[in-house]
């Protein structure tokens, strides 16, 4: 048994310790088993753990047996990850408030979890206009065709359109719920829920039996933003929950894109405010894909013969250090393509001769390894 799983689960039951504080505790003690056995003095060294909360923790710990809790929990919730599990999504662990327990249902793709396939969040109002629905269909299908994973919340409206359009294009989609995985909410999305469970993946930080609650959905939105490389707000009135997702995306250093519409349309007011505050505008599928790092495929007759291609004659200001030998060949090639100077994604694709989808995924992996940094305008450089 992975004992750390039991301690993540046990700590998640401690009242007063939320995801932000629990991540700090985990980082301070390295192992939550150590934290579980820590003295009051040791616990008080964690930023945010005051005397009153430390006292509450010490009172609650004897009432919880981590091993027994894990055994009992797995009977009702057999499929879940904690940050102690290698399958836990890497991008989600990066955020300040990673869920201590993440339940899943459906088809797990470890390439998603490891950040090798870029995920794009699509969110919006439950009551979209024809304009919003039409553009959501177009964008979701275009993303699916370029091998992006579409991530949304399975709500009525924009979420449902995004999921279903992605599936129609035979793409991969992930739904993040604000309930337990044994409850379908809203009920009218039952068929879509079942299709995603068969062909995609459904996630929730809430255990089986958790019913819809007003406070669950803003918390759910941080997971959508955390899993996503970028978030697209397709339509949002001023108080839409989609704007909460956009705020989380900004906080997590994710790109935010939004669809413009007339100021006369109330469903556009939130989007127009995002544009005013610096969100990127969605002008077309092609423009969006280029911004995200995937350009439309070249027709077969226009494909260059890459075996005959020669590298461009460009200055070589400094010889980059050799890449680590344990990187796979694609990552080695990408790293050798980059220098300390900022390079656009299109240039990286051209120089490396690697397909755009692989380039985007590879750059994300290199970012996670700390070998590459992303600059504004989808430009990259070696660190």
PLM region descriptions:
Residues 1-4, 83-383:
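Glycine-biased, small-residue-rich flexible motifs in mid-sequence functional cores and linkers
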């Amino acid at each position: 048994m992975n004992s750390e799983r039991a301690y993540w689960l046990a700590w998640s039951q401690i009242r007063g310790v939320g995801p932000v504080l629990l991540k700090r505790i985990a980082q301070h003690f390295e192992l939550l088993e150590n934290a579980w056995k820590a003295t009051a003095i040791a616990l008080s060294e964690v930023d945010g753990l005051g005397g009153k909360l430390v006292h509450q923790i010490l009172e609650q710990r004897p009432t919880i047996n981590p091993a027994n809790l894990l055994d009992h929990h797995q009977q009702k919730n057999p499929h879940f990850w904690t940050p102690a599990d290698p399958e836990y999504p890497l991008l989600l662990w990066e955020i300040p408030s990673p869920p201590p327990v993440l339940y899943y249902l459906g088809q797990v793709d470890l390439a998603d979890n490891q950040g090798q396939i870029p995920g794009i969040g699509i969110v919006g109002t439950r009551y979209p206009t024809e304009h919003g629905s039409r553009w959501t269909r177009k964008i979701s299908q275009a993303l699916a065709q370029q091998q992006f994973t579409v991530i949304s919340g399975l709500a009525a409206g924009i979420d449902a359109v995004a999921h279903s359009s992605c599936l129609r294009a035979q793409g991969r989609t992930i739904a993040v719920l604000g309930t337990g995985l044994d409850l379908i909410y809203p009920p009218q999305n039952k068929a879509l829920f079942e299709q995603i469970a068969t062909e995609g993946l459904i996630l929730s930080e809430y255990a089986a039996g958790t019913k819809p609650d007003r406070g669950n959905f803003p918390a759910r939105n941080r997971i959508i933003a955390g899993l996503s490389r970028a978030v697209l707000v397709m339509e949002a009135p001023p108080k839409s929950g989609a704007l909460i997702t956009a705020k989380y995306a900004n906080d997590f250093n994710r790109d935010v894109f939004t669809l413009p519409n007339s100021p006369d349309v109330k469903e556009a007011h939130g989007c127009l405010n995002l544009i005013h505050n610096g969100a990127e505008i969605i002008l077309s599928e092609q423009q969006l894909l280029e911004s995200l790092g995937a350009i439309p495929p070249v027709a077969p007759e226009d494909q260059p013969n890459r075996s005959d291609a020669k590298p461009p004659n460009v200055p070589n200001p400094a010889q980059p250090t050799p890449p680590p030998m344990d990187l796979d060949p694609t990552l080695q090639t990408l790293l050798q393509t980059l220098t300390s100077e900022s390079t656009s994604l299109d240039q990286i694709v051209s120089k490396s001769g690697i397909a755009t989808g692989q380039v985007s995924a590879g750059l994300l992996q290199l970012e996670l390894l700390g070998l590459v940094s992303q600059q504004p305008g989808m430009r990259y450089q070696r660190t």
